[in-house]
Amino acid sequence: MELPDLGFRPTIGAALTRAAAEFGDVDYVVTNTDRITYAQAERRSALLARRLLAHGVGKGTRVGLFYPNGTDWVLWWLAASRIGALVVPFSTLYAPGELAKGLRLGDVHLLIAPSRAVSVDFAVFLEDALPGLATNAGTQIAVREAPYLRQIWITGGTDRRWAHAVDFTDSVEDVVPQEILSAVEAEVCPADPAVMIHTSGSTADPKGVIHSHGVLMRQSAFLSGTMNGFAPPGLPTRYLSAMPFFWIGGILHVTGSLHSPLTILTLARTEPGAALELLERERGTGIAGWPTLTQRMLAHPDFSRRDLSSCPSLVDLPADLSLVAVPGNVPRHRSLTESGGGFSTTDVLVVDDTGEPVPAGSEGELWIRGPGIMLGYNKREPWEVFDADGWFHTGDRVFVLDDEPGIFYVGRSTELIKTSGANVSPKEVESVLDRHPSVQSSLVVGVGDGDRGQEVVAVVVPADPGTFDADQVSVDIRRDLSAYKVPRRWIVVTADDLPLLTSGKPDRRELTRRIEAGLIADGR
């Protein structure tokens, strides 16, 4: 398969150097409180990279980032990427227990976090996540919950003895010389692992998906053409990125914008009123995100009062529009059950249950392979991830059309729940519920929902039906589960109420059908 010629070495560092040289004065990332140009991003991330090198961080070192969307996230991501470190971004939606699990599964050596963001005191949060942390002091820490973790850097000031306080000043103390950084960057190659993203899967533990520099740069190359297509004539492309930077959609935005002079508008928390204000102030020309945000923006009372003439795609098109990038500059009008987009340098196959290809227009499971996909899963051997012919079986139910470049998403072959664009593993939620003293056993299923795609529903056999309190259980499990994973509906049953397969295992499909048909009532 022929790989596209990007005009530069496909690494994040090389792309940044080129961007700073060719359009350095253009805004790269703009928030409601801060902004950086491409040139500023290059200069400031270089200083941070030199500081990382001075502290022993280098190629392959696993660096965790625990920041919301913003310029700080981008600067640390660039700094670590430039020296070949493996960036492990963590969801700011995580509960303390989830962060501890991510640090352990990801073998993270260095964690970088702000002192406070989105009303969260991260020092307190980290001490809750890692109970042994508070007793640590000095430059090297050791906690049983995350055995590889040796350093935690905090920006914005901290009084914790276990933390190393860092800032974004131009001080050249505590850094290696510039020529060392240049020599290090020359050794970073497209094949090097660049990022590991933890995503919910069919197992209780999240999977660490590893992508290389080359894959990220090639897969994101289409973004500039697509987003430029939404900008009115004469206006620079400035689009609202409503995807979290700690997930693959957001990472493709920050990498894709390095290809041409695009400006990313983003918020630490994407609230529709604040998004409308930012779009108006910055003359935003498009939106890249899930359709639920677009719908909420259109329904917001400030929508009619904002001057959004620079963003005709939001003003003129239907309420369920989501501007999703697809190759060939094709904007796609889509609902929650459709997804525009193809894959660069990737073979795509849609197959039936026997593995045979299905004709265009027919639903099947999506298989992908080639140089455009992930390197693999963390701590998994290749044969555990790919089949003998190199295909990755995604578990996504899709269809394609002869005259369309996109892939249309229908649902999941697996039990994975997709709610408001996020994946939820039923087994992960069940493992937390089943540890709760009020729960004898549980089943978690996804039930169709018009706004979210699917709603997380817990079917619980309580330890004591007379005292079971779903509201209290919801509060209790938030230490170990992100808010979007906490069930929104609770159904209390007896063990005899659960439909079973001939094997004696619960029949999840039949259970879901009964809930959707109203044959099993909600209860607390």
Q: Language-model features: where?
A:
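Conserved AMP-binding A3 loop
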Residues: 37-39, 185-187, 194-221
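Conserved AMP-binding/adenylate-forming
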Residues: 192, 262, 312, 320-406, ...
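AMP-binding/adenylate-forming catalytic domain of the ANL superfamily
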Residues: 150, 482-503
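Structural core segment of the AMP-binding/adenylate-forming
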Residues: 55, 86-168, 299-304, 464-466
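Conserved AMP-binding/adenylate-forming core of the ANL superfamily
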Residues: 4, 8, 17, 27-78, ...
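Conserved AMP-binding/adenylation subdomain of ANL enzymes
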Residues: 217-238, 246-286, 300
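Conserved pre-ATP/AMP-binding loop-to-beta segment of ANL
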Residues: 24, 145-146, 160-198, 204-205, ...
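AMP-binding/adenylate-forming catalytic core of the ANL superfamily
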Residues: 50, 94-103, 111-113, 287, ...
